[in-house]
Amino acid sequence: MAYRKLGRTSSQRKAMLRDLTTDLLINESIVTTEARAKEIRKTVEKMITLGKRGDLHARRQAAAFVRNEIASENYDEATEKYTTTTALQKLFSEIAPRYAERNGGYTRILKTEPRRGDAAPMAIIELV
C-alpha cells in the first residue's frame, strides 16, 4: 500500500486526514502543503463516491470517517429557530448530487508559492 507518512505516527496521520477531509467538504477549498493535498485527495474522492451511492451502509461508512462538525447554520425567522447542517449532511445532500454524472476526479490541486519560513511547497485543493 503506497501512502505518505507525513512525519507523523499512524494515529496522528489518520486524525489529520479526517480533519482535512472534513474541512474540505465544509469549505470546498483549503490551502495546505502539496503532500497533504495529494493524500487527502484520495479520502475526499472516496467520501464523495460514498455520497453518490447514498444507501444506509455508505452513509454509515462516511459517518465513521467524517467528523461531526457543523457546516452551516441558518436562522429561520418564521419559526424563530436555528437550523444546522453537519458536514455529513452536506456531503449527501449538496455535494454528492452535484457530481452525479461525473465518474471520479472531484478535486483539483493548484500549486501556489512556497510557504514563508520553511519554503514548504503549498497547494490549494478544491472541489471541481
Swiss-Prot record:
| Gene behind this protein | rplQ
Q: Which domain of life is it from?
A: Bacteria
Which terms in the Gene Ontology molecular function aspect does this entry carry? structural constituent of ribosome
Give a single Pfam family match.
Ribosomal_L17
Output the InterPro entries linked to this UniProt entry: Ribosomal_bL17 (IPR000456), Ribosomal_bL17_CS (IPR047859), Ribosomal_bL17_sf (IPR036373)
Q: Give the family from UniProt.
A: Belongs to the bacterial ribosomal protein bL17 family.
Q: What is this protein called?
A: Large ribosomal subunit protein bL17
* Organism, as annotated: Streptococcus sanguinis (strain SK36)
**GO BP, sorted A to Z:** translation
Q: Which UniProt keywords apply?
A: Ribonucleoprotein, Ribosomal protein
GO (cellular component) term, any one: cytosolic large ribosomal subunit
Gene3D superfamilies hit by this protein: Ribosomal protein L17
User: What assembly does the database describe for this protein?
Assistant: Part of the 50S ribosomal subunit. Contacts protein L32.
